[in-house]
Regions:
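Short, solvent-exposed recognition patches
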Residues: 36-104, 111-112
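N-terminal "mature-domain start" segment
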Residues: 19-53, 87-91, 129-141
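Sec-dependent N-terminal signal peptides
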Residues: 4-18
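A short, solvent-exposed beta-edge/loop patch
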Residues: 20-21, 88-141
Length: 141
């Protein structure tokens, strides 16, 4: 029994402290963030699971921003990102690695084992707008 308590105490002592970070897509991208990216005020995001991803969708009229989040290693992320609709090209200055896909309709970002994908429908935000929403989300990751 003492040995078990010692092991438990040791594990607790070396375990990292919990941080305020999240992988909830509706927490990573707020309604304010989504509204700025879409150019319209949006309500609360709709959280759901889409296949391997946790998702959050913000919509107003025909404008939609969907945020997809999953845990993934870098090599698999790169391979997956390059399979998106062309053109697919790297975007510097976001996370550890990022790609634009589908003529700017999607931004795929990888940081420390987490993929965050942003898909835009009904709006064609400039790259800087995409970077702004991505960097805001990554600060919360």
């Amino acid at each position: 029994m003492r040995r078990l308590l010692f092991v438990a105490a040791t594990v607790l002592a070396v375990a990292p402290a919990a941080s305020g970070a999240t992988t909830s897509p509706c927490a990573l991208v707020t309604a304010d963030d989504a509204g700025k990216a879409l150019g319209v005020k949006v309500g609360t995001g709709k959280a759901q699971t889409l296949g391997l991803y946790k998702a959050c969708t913000y919509a107003k009229g025909r404008k939609t921003l969907t945020v997809l989040v999953r845990q993934i290693d870098k090599k698999t992320f790169e391979k997956s990102a390059k399979k998106n609709p062309p053109p697919v090209f790297p975007i510097p200055g976001i996370g550890d690695e990022a790609f634009s896909a589908g003529g700017g309709s999607a931004l795929l970002v990888w940081k420390k084992g987490t993929e965050v994908t942003f898909t835009f429908i009904g709006v064609s935000p400039v790259v800087q707008t995409q970077k702004d929403v991505a960097n805001a989300a990554l600060k919360r990751l």
